[in-house]
């Protein structure tokens, strides 16, 4: 997030991982990007990972799915409409990200869109979220 609240998408992973690999990926991104917090959806495998990372002292924002996927995407749709989202030019994952975004909500896959949707919600509510972490 820039000081002007623009969304920067600097990295993107898409794939199915078992829980141990999910934790490794979460740790990898934590260390790679020197995050102030991490956001994890609080359902399925995320519940246990949230508990473990919190017990390790990591600041975790628990994401709760509310409404349908289109409703959750509203904040990010507005970021895109206002040209406040930037993708890393030339990134190997960029084609997959853009395909999922362009096919949403009727595409075969929308996992990456879900992540972008949550990012938009987090940025939109940044002040209240950061103080609550």
Model-derived segments and spans:
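Intrinsically disordered or highly flexible coil/loop and linker segments, enriched in small
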Residues: 32-35, 85, 110, 125-129
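Acidic two-metal-ion nuclease catalytic site recognized across multiple nuclease folds
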Residues: 119-133
């Amino acid at each position: 997030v820039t000081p002007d609240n623009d969304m920067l998408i600097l990295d993107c992973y898409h794939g199915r991982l078992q829980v141990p690999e999910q934790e490794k990926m979460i740790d990898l991104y934590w260390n790679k990007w020197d995050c102030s917090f991490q956001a994890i959806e609080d359902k399925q495998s995320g519940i246990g990972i949230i508990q473990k990372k919190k017990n390790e002292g990591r600041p975790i924002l628990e994401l709760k799915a509310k409404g349908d996927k289109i409703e959750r995407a509203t904040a990010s749709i507005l970021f895109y409409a206002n040209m406040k989202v930037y993708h890393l030019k030339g990134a190997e994952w960029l084609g997959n990200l853009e395909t999922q975004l362009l096919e949403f909500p009727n595409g075969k896959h929308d996992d990456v869109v879900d992540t972008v949707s949550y990012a938009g919600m987090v940025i939109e509510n940044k002040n209240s979220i950061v103080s609550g972490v």
